[in-house]
Every structure is written in C-alpha cells, then in structure tokens.
C-alpha cells in the first residue's frame, strides 16, 4: 500500500509539472499545505481569513496574493517599521489588508488598480477591520500617477515600502519610476518573479497562455534587477516568488 501511495504522489507531481501554472512553487502540495495549516492559518487575522475565503469564490482568484506571502509581507512591514507605502495592483485587497494591518494607525498606502469593482469586493472587510482610513485608492493605470509623483521632487525618497503586483509587461517601467520614490534603505517588493516555475521550463513545456505570454517580461525584469547597482536584491520562493530590492543609492 505504501508503494501505491508513493506512486500516486509521484504521478500527481508529474501531472502538476506537465502544465506550468501552479500557485505554489513547492514540489510537494502536501508540504505546502503543512506550511499553511501549521504556520499561516492558525495566526492569520480573522479579517484576512474572511477576505481570503471571499476572494476564493471569485473567478479570477488566482490573481490574489497567497496566504503565506500575505503573512510574510505583514511581518516584513513590521520589521522595517514601514509607515508610508504604495501598492501597484490591488485586486480584492488581500495584500493591501496585510499591509494596512501592519503599519501604524497614521500610516498611509497609495493603492492603484485599473479595476475598482474588484477592490470593492474586499472593501467591506477592510472597513470592518478598521484600516480603510489608511488607504488612498486610485482607479486607473499606475504609470500616469507615478509620473506625477516623480515630477515633484518632494516625493522622492518618501516611501518606506512599495509592492508591485500588476501587469508584468510594465514591471520595468514601474521600476524606472519607483526607484526614485522609495527612500534609501527602503524596500521594493516585486511579486511573481518566479512566474509559476516557468522561467526554467523547457521551451516545449505546456503552459497556460498568460504564463507563456508574460514569461519573457519576468525574465527581463529579473536580469534588470540583478544588474541595478542602486539596489540590493533577494529573490525568495514565497508564493509565486517575490524579489525584494533594498535601495542603497
């Protein structure tokens, strides 16, 4: 029986890797579930649990930040004592809520997304959690807003943390702007930088269309971040991969 069980698990892993596009990067789904059930879910704030379960019912739920990454962001923001933050790409607001719960009562989040309707799915939960006053939500493309911010020198170096989880084909365009807005010693977080594990997959690997389409943009971003002398970087296999860039100049 043990051999049969091992064969089933091996077959499941093969099936998973035949189509790149799985949210967790861990090879074992059971191990990922262990992390969630042992470390994440027992300590997840009730409001984040409510929003996670609400988002799971939405047809585009794959866009949400994973629960383990939400926990990571929440702790990271506390460690760096972040107060003035920015989020590019909001969806229903799970990572936004993780940020809002981590920063102080007078902290601020400039949040941008092209779809307010998705944001309003999570807004009642955010309001009930008592942190909606920290959020300045802007509907529409982020680049025009960033251009306005960069134009005013008073905004340079004023952000403690900036999280980017939006259109992957604009990640480099975002980086060109937000590098001036984050303070020296501040952090930028780029989500999905391991892109469903597709970055090292053979060219003939079956992939979902969106995974294949954005793959080259993520590869280009990762090379650009590694070559940027203005930041120190650390790529972490949390969620779908997150790269942290600490501005040093």
UniProtKB/Swiss-Prot annotation:
<feature type="binding site">
    <location>
        <position position="167"/>
    </location>
    <ligand>
        <name>S-adenosyl-L-methionine</name>
    </ligand>
</feature>
<feature type="binding site">
    <location>
        <position position="23"/>
    </location>
    <ligand>
        <name>substrate</name>
    </ligand>
</feature>
<feature type="binding site">
    <location>
        <position position="87"/>
    </location>
    <ligand>
        <name>S-adenosyl-L-methionine</name>
    </ligand>
</feature>
<dbReference type="GO" id="GO:0009809">
    <property type="term" value="P:lignin biosynthetic process"/>
</dbReference>
<keyword id="KW-0808">Transferase</keyword>
<dbReference type="GO" id="GO:0010597">
    <property type="term" value="P:green leaf volatile biosynthetic process"/>
</dbReference>
<feature type="binding site">
    <location>
        <position position="192"/>
    </location>
    <ligand>
        <name>a divalent metal cation</name>
    </ligand>
</feature>
<feature type="binding site">
    <location>
        <position position="95"/>
    </location>
    <ligand>
        <name>S-adenosyl-L-methionine</name>
    </ligand>
</feature>
<feature type="binding site">
    <location>
        <position position="113"/>
    </location>
    <ligand>
        <name>S-adenosyl-L-methionine</name>
    </ligand>
</feature>
<feature type="binding site">
    <location>
        <position position="142"/>
    </location>
    <ligand>
        <name>S-adenosyl-L-methionine</name>
    </ligand>
</feature>
<keyword id="KW-0949">S-adenosyl-L-methionine</keyword>
<keyword id="KW-0438">Lignin biosynthesis</keyword>
<feature type="binding site">
    <location>
        <position position="65"/>
    </location>
    <ligand>
        <name>S-adenosyl-L-methionine</name>
    </ligand>
</feature>
<dbReference type="GO" id="GO:0007623">
    <property type="term" value="P:circadian rhythm"/>
</dbReference>
<keyword id="KW-0479">Metal-binding</keyword>
<feature type="binding site">
    <location>
        <position position="191"/>
    </location>
    <ligand>
        <name>a divalent metal cation</name>
    </ligand>
</feature>
<dbReference type="GO" id="GO:0042409">
    <property type="term" value="F:caffeoyl-CoA O-methyltransferase activity"/>
</dbReference>
<dbReference type="InterPro" id="IPR029063">
    <property type="entry name" value="SAM-dependent_MTases_sf"/>
</dbReference>
<comment type="function">
    <text>Involved in the production of floral volatile phenylpropanoids in flowers of fragrant cultivars (e.g. cv. Mitchell and cv. V26) from cinnamic acid, a common precursor with the anthocyanin biosynthesis pathway involved in flower pigmentation. Methylates caffeoyl-CoA to feruloyl-CoA, also able to methylate 5-hydroxyferuloyl-CoA.</text>
</comment>
<comment type="similarity">
    <text>Belongs to the class I-like SAM-binding methyltransferase superfamily. Cation-dependent O-methyltransferase family. CCoAMT subfamily.</text>
</comment>
<feature type="binding site">
    <location>
        <begin position="89"/>
        <end position="90"/>
    </location>
    <ligand>
        <name>S-adenosyl-L-methionine</name>
    </ligand>
</feature>
<feature type="binding site">
    <location>
        <position position="196"/>
    </location>
    <ligand>
        <name>substrate</name>
    </ligand>
</feature>
<dbReference type="GO" id="GO:0046872">
    <property type="term" value="F:metal ion binding"/>
</dbReference>
<dbReference type="GO" id="GO:0032259">
    <property type="term" value="P:methylation"/>
</dbReference>
<dbReference type="InterPro" id="IPR050362">
    <property type="entry name" value="Cation-dep_OMT"/>
</dbReference>
<keyword id="KW-0963">Cytoplasm</keyword>
<dbReference type="InterPro" id="IPR002935">
    <property type="entry name" value="SAM_O-MeTrfase"/>
</dbReference>
<keyword id="KW-0489">Methyltransferase</keyword>
<dbReference type="GO" id="GO:0009698">
    <property type="term" value="P:phenylpropanoid metabolic process"/>
</dbReference>
<feature type="binding site">
    <location>
        <position position="165"/>
    </location>
    <ligand>
        <name>a divalent metal cation</name>
    </ligand>
</feature>
<dbReference type="GO" id="GO:0005829">
    <property type="term" value="C:cytosol"/>
</dbReference>
<protein>
    <recommendedName>
        <fullName>Caffeoyl-CoA O-methyltransferase 1</fullName>
        <ecNumber>2.1.1.104</ecNumber>
        <ecNumber>2.1.1.-</ecNumber>
    </recommendedName>
</protein>
<comment type="pathway">
    <text>Aromatic compound metabolism; phenylpropanoid biosynthesis.</text>
</comment>
<dbReference type="Pfam" id="PF01596">
    <property type="entry name" value="Methyltransf_3"/>
</dbReference>
<feature type="binding site">
    <location>
        <position position="165"/>
    </location>
    <ligand>
        <name>substrate</name>
    </ligand>
</feature>
């Amino acid at each position: 029986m043990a051999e049969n069980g091992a064969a089933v698990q091996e077959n499941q892993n093969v099936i998973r890797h035949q189509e790149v596009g799985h949210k967790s990067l861990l090879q074992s789904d059971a191990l990922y579930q262990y992390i969630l059930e042992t470390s994440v879910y027992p300590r997840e704030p009730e409001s984040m649990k409510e929003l996670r379960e609400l988002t799971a019912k939405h047809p585009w739920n794959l866009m949400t930040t994973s629960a383990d990454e939400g926990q990571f962001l929440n702790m990271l923001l506390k460690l760096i004592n972040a107060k003035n933050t920015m989020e590019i790409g909001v969806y229903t607001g799970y990572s936004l809520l993780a940020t809002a719960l981590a920063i102080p009562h007078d902290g601020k989040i400039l949040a941008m997304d092209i779809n307010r309707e998705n944001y309003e799915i999570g807004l009642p939960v955010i309001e009930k959690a008592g942190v909606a006053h920290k959020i300045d939500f802007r509907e529409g493309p982020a680049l025009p807003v960033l251009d306005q911010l960069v134009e005013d020198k008073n905004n340079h170096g004023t952000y403690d943390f900036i999280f980017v989880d939006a259109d992957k084909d604009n990640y480099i365009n975002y980086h060109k702007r937000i590098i001036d807005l984050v303070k020296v010693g501040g952090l930028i977080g780029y989500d999905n930088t391991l892109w469903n594990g597709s970055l090292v997959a053979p060219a003939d690997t079956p992939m979902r269309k969106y995974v294949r389409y954005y793959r080259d943009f993520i590869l280009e971003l990762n090379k650009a971040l590694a070559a940027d002398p203005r930041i120190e970087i650390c790529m972490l296999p949390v969620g779908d991969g997150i790269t942290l860039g600490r501005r040093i100049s």
